[in-house]
Amino acid sequence: MTYGKKNIVAGLFFLAAFMIYGFVLISLRDFAPGKALWIADYATGTHFESRLAHVHGNLFAFLNIMIGYLILHLPVSAFSAKWVSWLGLTGMLMPIGIVAEFALGASPVFVLAGGIAIVASMTWLGFAVWRAKLV
């Protein structure tokens, strides 16, 4: 699979997964036995972290779809395409890390690594497009 296509495929599956996760959050708000407590904790703790993961998961899915599309359609060097692609995919560790933090008590290292990777990917892609010979 080519660089770019990997990002589009991963982004679409990631988007689907975090959309399903959004439906789980809706069911917790509307139908779960402890829904009053869930609603009361809207801006704190697990509820806040779960919403943070949902929004970043969908954002990073979209960013990977965009990364893939731009890599495939703009004259970005192969070296830049490879690194931008892998950094974008690595960025998806951030929302996964947020879920792992509150659900499994995992270290925030995945959140930090993913955040750094997605910022690096966007910055590198910006410079690569800037340097590209566009007509």
Each model region followed by its residue ranges:
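Polytopic transmembrane helical bundles with strong interfacial aromatic enrichment
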Residues: 2-54, 58-135
